[in-house]
Amino acid sequence: VVFNSNTFQNYLTSKVTEVLSEQFKTKITINHIRYYPFTGFALEQVYWGDQKNDTLFYVEDLKFNFGGFNSLESKLTLNDVVLEGAYCKMVTYPDHTFNLDVLFNILDPNDTIPDTLSPPFKLYFNRVACHNTRFRLIDSTRVFEPEGFDGFNQDYNNIELLARDFWIIKDSLHFDLKKLSCLERSGLELKQLAGVATICPQAMLFDELNMQTANSNIRNQFHMIYNGWGEMANFNYKVQLKGNLHNSTFGMKDLHYFAPLLREMKLDESFTISGEGKGTVNNLRLKNMNIKFGSKSVFKGSGSVKGLPSVNDMFLDIQSDDAETNANDIEHLVKMELPNEMDRLGQMGFKGRFTGFYTDFVAYGNLKTALGNGQSDLNMKLGDSLTIPSYSGNLTLNDFDIGQLINQPLVGKTSFSASVKGKGFNLKDIETSLESNIAYVEANGYRYKNTRILGDFKHKMFAGKLDMNDENAEVHFDGTIDLNKDIPLYKFKANIAYADLKALHFDTSNLVFSTKMDINF
């Protein structure tokens, strides 16, 4: 009866707020405390201020049951805690003070003479639920970004949370998170977060993780290590990440909130990911990666990614143990139409090293295509438009069906090594200088061997020199071949020292000839 009287409840409210305000050296108010027999306490309009007289924490309704106090363990138990309409704001002020210190300085004051005999105070909740809650993390020393996710101005609304076995020990939290959902200011929606969590001023650990957004589903383990809460405001550069993912799905649409340029580029592919990663967002190291996307694209390997979240500054150093893709998957990934020649390469594979930016990189390793295999040491520059790439370096092809690539039925396979410098892959766009040693090339049903080419190919026209020392043909060529017409135009000087026309499939009779020619037709 006494507990239910308004006089006692008003006295209790006044006394609790007085004690807490004195203990934490800040303004704490509770509009009313109600006690319900067998169901517990209800606190209304609880306000907790910080050292700047701004809001640290506020809750419209807070309900709980008193579970008891164990003096030997310094453990207070509260059961079935429910918060309705809560608001929490963590702020780094312009003078670099952090408002949450008003709480941690009391919970863990670092006394000069610590009491090593007394166990730390522990607060235990068997169940915690939050409804219609808001959380903000602000660094007032920084300039805020107007759009996208801003680590210096994080604002989470519509928070719904359910946790069990919730411990607060000094300045650390540990709990079994059953459900967390929220909507961030940028538009990023967290549909579900579950796992075993530990949160303290130095780390945020999530094990048995299951995180779902509209486009992603991250599973297994994710840890964040930092030197104080203030570093969360500089998340991309200060917070150390460690993840171990298994059969997770990651959608690039979620990256749009962190790198708006990706939205402009309309990059929206989804990836299935397994592997390990550690480092900051700005400097990630990856290993044992297994990434799949599109219909048949896969990457297995390790490496590092620097420069995120800026896509333009993203620098890749990747070791590919096995990578496969095709023109259709690439077109869907980068939202550009590739030349038909790329589609004829079929399923392409690469095993080697990839370093550089996504628009300017070096690929060194072994190539595999449906038309033949090879080795590359090439620098590719895709440019801002991603339409006509430029390249330079060395390329070797083995038993490669170049006739099928360029859609010329009279041309067959070839093996060659070449130094190239130019741009474009489409026949109408290509501008390339090359120096090539051709082990063989098939033409008109004959395999020509031992050929060297030095020249330029531009505007569907080749200009250069060819020296052939085949057993059935010795030819020295200097001139041009123009492929702009249905019937090629030739302008060259040629010294045919020896040519067996029957062996070369130009005649059925045993005709061998040699000549010098000056051709223009």
Task: For every predicted segment, state its role.
Residues 248-252, 323-331, 404-406:
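Outer-membrane beta-barrel translocator/channel fold
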Residues 5, 32-101, 106-141, 157-178, ...:
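Flexible beta-edge/linker motif
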Residues 125-133, 434-436, 494-496:
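Tryptophan-anchored aromatic micro-motifs
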Residues 1-24, 87:
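N-terminal type II signal-anchor transmembrane helix
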Residues 176-180, 203-210, 283-291, 359-368, ...:
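Transmembrane beta-strand segments that form the barrel wall of outer-membrane beta-barrel proteins
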